[in-house]
Design a protein with these regions (language model features):
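Extracytoplasmic copper-binding redox domains, predominantly the cupredoxin/blue-copper superfamily
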Residues: 25-230
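Bacterial N-terminal signal peptides
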Residues: 11-22
Length: 230
């Protein structure tokens, strides 16, 4: 028994409808990876002399406003892929540890929360303020292992400080764009970057660099090295 043209047409139509209902296909490994190394010629800053609670904090602390190693590799630089949005809010863990914020720089998406835990057996009085002066919170953390969670609703840079230990500084880079932070070796990596020309922007608390454009290809990695300066 032969198959009519009508039967073939209906079968094809059924397949087309099923594909449409399933939505657009996504290729495994779609998007590329951007890697790089960030350096600076600026010297490391002088250590901080501790004036309160030296038994917990130590006699001195490294000044990580410029966290650079002996070969110029620069840590704590936020690298952002401009226009590449990240949907789900995410929280940022942050510790008070030996009278320093650990990590010093963290990324956070608008609507997420910073979850602060004190590891120190001394009083920390935490402040968080936006660049426009808006105060997000002012909380006391008098005992170790106390965790407090506070939401951050708007994009921008939030500065963290402690009025008890005035040298303490930390930063929350709040953004809904794909971002990463350079490590002690100056290296960063952004995964699942859409194919095409992407502009990278760089934020550091002290140093600067101009934006850089890179061409990303699906399933491939592209490397970019950047030098920051004052």
């Amino acid at each position: 028994m032969g198959i009519s043209r009508k039967t073939v047409y209906l079968a094809a139509l059924t397949c087309a409808v099923a594909i449409a209902m399933a939505g657009p296909s996504v290729r495994a490994g779609a998007g590329g990876t951007v890697t790089g190394t960030i350096t600076t010629k600026e010297p490391a800053m002088k250590p901080i002399s501790v004036t309160i609670d030296p038994g917990v904090c130590g006699q001195s602390l490294p000044n990580e406003a410029i966290a650079v190693d002996g070969t110029g590799h620069l840590a704590n630089v936020v690298v952002t892929a401009t226009g590449v949005k990240v949907q789900a809010p995410a929280d940022a863990p942050l510790n008070n540890e030996k009278c320093s914020f650990v990590p010093r720089v963290a990324t956070l998406r608008p609507g997420g929360s910073v979850k602060m835990t004190s590891k120190d057996p001394v009083l920390h009085t935490m402040h968080a303020a936006a660049a426009d002066g808006k105060a997000y919170f002012n909380v006391s953390m008098p005992i170790p292992n106390l965790t407090i969670s506070k939401p951050i609703d708007k994009p921008g840079v939030v500065t963290l400080s402690c009025s008890t230990h005035t040298w303490m500084r930390g930063y929350l880079f709040v953004t809904d764009e794909l971002s990463g932070i350079s490590g002690r070796d100056g290296k960063f990596q952004l995964d699942n970057v859409p194919a095409g020309v992407v502009e990278l922007r760089f934020w550091h608390e002290t140093l600067k660099a101009a934006p850089v454009k890179v061409t990303v290809k699906d399933g491939q990695s592209v490397n970019v090295d950047v030098v920051l300066a004052k």
